[in-house]
């Protein structure tokens, strides 16, 4: 928030959506919907200080879905049914019988997405079989490595987590869109703030669905940064979002035009209610969103 009370951080998102609609190049895409696209627009930056949580206010965002999906990633899960049973249907399309058959996964059960995000974060390099197999101790646990480096060598320039594993693409229902995150610790000057170091996260996202996906991704990685900061005893700093192919699906244009006319309100606050020490101990009930006052929900169809 700026001194004049305007939410400039949400405005940067809305300005980019408008620019894509006005100036974007038409591109056909794998879903058959078609998009307007810009490549490598300016980064989006969001402060996470003072418990600020960059949850868009110009439409109501499915906060519970964001939290449950991230917990699902962190658990290394790849079974979309585990989310669907909790009312989070965002992966149902990519895990449907029709979609899996179309992708050549006729022997997989419905919901088995293959070695997607959570598997790569927690078991990079392990041999994937099914979503029901136990991969404990297999592959590289990138998330645990990130946390260890933050605790032992916070100046390290290799505090990185990647979901991009070309060796596994032929097993994935959908290759990752948000693929590469780097964490950076800054140290306060003497007498500044709480005195604790600040943790920031930079995300590179190759494919950026501005209408549906990007609002989710912003909040999800802001939440991830908050959770990691909690377990390493740091303060949250900033989330920086680097976008590759930033696109608006043609059937989202009218909805986004409506959203752009709305005035952003102050971002809510995110409170973590327990003193969690282990990244694997977080639960849905640990999080509380305060002062979220969004405009009404805007329906947009997901292209699969």
UniProtKB/Swiss-Prot annotation:
It comes from the Eukaryota. Keywords: Methyltransferase, Nucleotide biosynthesis, Nucleus, Transferase. One of its GO terms (molecular function) is thymidylate synthase activity. It comes from Saccharomyces cerevisiae (strain ATCC 204508 / S288c). Induction: Transcribed in a periodic manner during the cell cycle with maximal mRNA levels occurring just prior to the onset of DNA replication. The promoter contains 8-base-pair motifs (ACGCGTNA) called the MluI cell-cycle boxes (MCBs), which mediate transcription regulation by SWI6. InterPro entries: Thymidate_synth/dCMP_Mease (IPR045097), Thymidate_synth/dCMP_Mease_dom (IPR023451), Thymidate_synth/dCMP_Mease_sf (IPR036926), Thymidylate_synthase (IPR000398), Thymidylate_synthase_AS (IPR020940). This is Thymidylate synthase. Pathway: Pyrimidine metabolism; dTTP biosynthesis. Its main location: nucleus. Optimum pH is 6.8-7.2.
């Amino acid at each position: 928030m700026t001194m004049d009370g305007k939410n400039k951080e949400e405005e940067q998102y809305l300005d980019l959506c408008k620019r894509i609609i006005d100036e974007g190049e038409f591109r056909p895409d794998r879903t058959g919907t078609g998009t307007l696209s810009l490549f490598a627009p300016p980064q989006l930056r969001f402060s996470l200080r003072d418990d600020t949580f960059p949850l868009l206010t110009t439409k109501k965002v499915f906060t519970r879905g964001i939290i449950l999906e991230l917990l699902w990633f962190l658990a290394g899960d790849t079974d979309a049914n585990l989310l669907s049973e909790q009312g989070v249907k965002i992966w149902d399309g990519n895990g449907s019988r029709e979609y899996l058959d179309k992708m050549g996964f006729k022997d997989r059960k419905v919901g088995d997405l293959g070695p997607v995000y959570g598997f790569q974060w927690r078991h990079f390099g392990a041999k994937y079989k099914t979503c029901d197999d136990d991969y404990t101790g297999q592959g590289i646990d990138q998330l645990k490595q990130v946390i260890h480096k933050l605790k032992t060598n916070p100046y390290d320039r290799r505090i990185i987590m990647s979901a991009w594993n070309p060796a596994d693409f032929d097993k994935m229902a959908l290759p990752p869109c948000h693929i590469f995150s780097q964490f950076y610790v800054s140290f306060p000057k003497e007498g500044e703030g709480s005195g604790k170091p600040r943790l920031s996260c930079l995300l590179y996202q190759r494919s950026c669905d501005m209408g549906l996906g990007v609002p989710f991704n912003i909040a999800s990685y802001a939440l991830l940064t908050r959770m990691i900061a909690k377990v390493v005893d740091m303060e949250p700093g900033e989330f920086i979002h680097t976008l590759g192919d930033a696109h608006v699906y043609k059937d989202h244009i009218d909805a986004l035009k409506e959203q752009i006319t709305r005035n952003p309100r102050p971002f809510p606050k995110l409170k973590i209610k327990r003193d969690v020490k282990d990244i694997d101990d977080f639960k849905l009930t640990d999080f509380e969103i305060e002062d979220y006052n969004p405009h009404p929900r805007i329906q947009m169809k997901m292209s699969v």
